[in-house]
């Protein structure tokens, strides 16, 4: 009998516990009560009405684009009957970040999130015919698109990416005649911006960024970042693929410089790997050689520095490719604890490539990164020494390759060099240092760009030097 009573008591206790568990939520609101018991029904900040989302328990207050959110006043707060909160009407709150509002009603409570969101009206991306990337100047509110001369600019279809919650006119995906500038207006609440879009058809580009894919938007992030810079900063520049050059679908008759910035996860180590990993460049080598021999210049960075050996720059010796190469994967890029650098070669501090740089402690150093930047350290350099590599000293390297040393690593390796223009052939500038890097997949907290600006300064110097 005693056992039976104990069993009944135990069963009753378990039943009560299960009922309690079923009747309560993580927010201490009984499932037997109305959900409105701890509800924010209305809230305004500085008389700007908040939008209450009951599902996510979020109140979002939309504000003008440049509104000061440091000290906002709760001008209205209406809660469900009998409820109170840790924020009261008339209170001043700092809305630079989201605020938590704790609403209680008797033994019940719910936590809500209060967010101030400035209205934003920006165009982030403007791509024509899914191929040609627009250069956006956010300050001037202009978008510039360069297309090959054969493209019909009277019926181009732009794909436009703009601020969340905004509307854009004309609509994205609708064909437009860009014979004359077209104004795109983005509106989001109190914010509005007008972007003037100019499309220029270029029959004969002045500069070309070359890559292995049909469009620049298909480039890897490192190369795409570099290409985007060129399109925004070098007049009459275009992206072209190696296939375009091989098939001669791009007119290079007025092209002053071809830039190839070649990234490959894990690196490209020497002659044979270059042939294997860049077959598209090998396929176009005859056209590239003709361009070079007719006076065309090259700017070759990272693993693209292998190319001169295949287009006759070093004579018939194909085995003059960089002999000391490595690199990491973009997704696992190394964190820079501080500035990385290489050195200007003795006697070359006055070279045009090194002018106007952001200077550091060492006047002979070329600093290119800052703390908090992630870098793949993709390197294609020449080891110098009698131990291995075929170049006993710098003079031996210059004698065999015909190159001129511009920059060296800490161990004396050749990391930047040029093949000067001669006999009607174009000049070539090469940078194989792992410090020359355009893309960081993320930036650590507190990152401030200082020395990384030197990457774009060096690049602009290279274009100015090669097109003079």
Q: PLM ranges: what are they?
A:
Residues 2-13:
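Bacterial N-terminal signal peptides that target proteins for export
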Residues 19-23:
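C-terminal motif of bacterial Sec signal peptides marking the signal peptidase cleavage site
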Residues 24-206:
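Beta-rich interaction/scaffold domains
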Residues 206-208, 429:
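Conserved beta-strand elements of the Class I
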Residues 208, 216-317:
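Helical hinge/lid and interdomain linker segments adjacent to catalytic or ligand-binding clefts
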Residues 270-375:
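A glycine-rich, often tryptophan-bearing local segment used as a flexible ligand/cofactor-contacting loop or short
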Residues 334-433:
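Catalytic beta-strand/loop cores that center a nucleophilic Ser/Cys/Thr
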Residues 404, 411-468:
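Extracellular ligand-binding/catalytic regions of CAZymes and related secreted enzymes
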